Amino acid sequence: MYLFEYKNSLGGKSMEKNNKELKLEKKYDLAWDSYSKEDLEAVFSLNERYIEFMSECKTERECITKSIEIAEKGGYINLKDIIKNKETLKAGDKVYAELMGKVLVMFLIGEESLENGMNILGAHVDSPRIDLKQNPLYEDSDISLFKTHYYGGVKKYQWVTTPLAIHGVVVKKDGTIVNIVIGEDDKDPVVGISDLLIHLSADQMAKTLAKGIDGESLNVCVGSMPLEDKDAKQK
């Protein structure tokens, strides 16, 4: 960045640019250079907790469930319990409320009235993923597959030929909720999206990165073993 200084001539007849240039620079120091040993330990400890959270929580509901668990360990109490017990909130109390398992609000009660305002810190759960369609199951070439549609800003080429996991919630007719997680344990079945072999993909390789894998091709292989009944017409 340069600052040029202009001055009026004494006679006011012309404007002259001062030849002197003032170069403005801002120096930035690496944060790593300022960290003590204790600071570094704290940084990596936080990173480990963050990785654990991201590895465990793949959907909005899972993030909210885990966040509530962390909040309760930090002293937060469910607002429903406060209301049920007809308790009164006071300054310093910590309460939370959740909505449909996908929204969480947490309050640290202050000393002044809400009429004087409140500090709000907001965030959203960003969960890029591939969702199953309403009736996803179909068969092709004796293989069972799920039709999908993607949610969020996913790079489609990153989702093929890599082990995937299924996370979801099933609500039975009687209202019972079943949480499903398949693929996170090493002993779980493996699901994934296939891709063309290198010697069959000349046309695909000629396409741009954005078009090499299209959304309609993101179908998940979920079964390839036939039924044990050898006489069954449909296996």
Q: What are these language model-derived features?
A:
Residues 2, 7-235:
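N-terminal hydrophobic/helix-forming segments and targeting peptides
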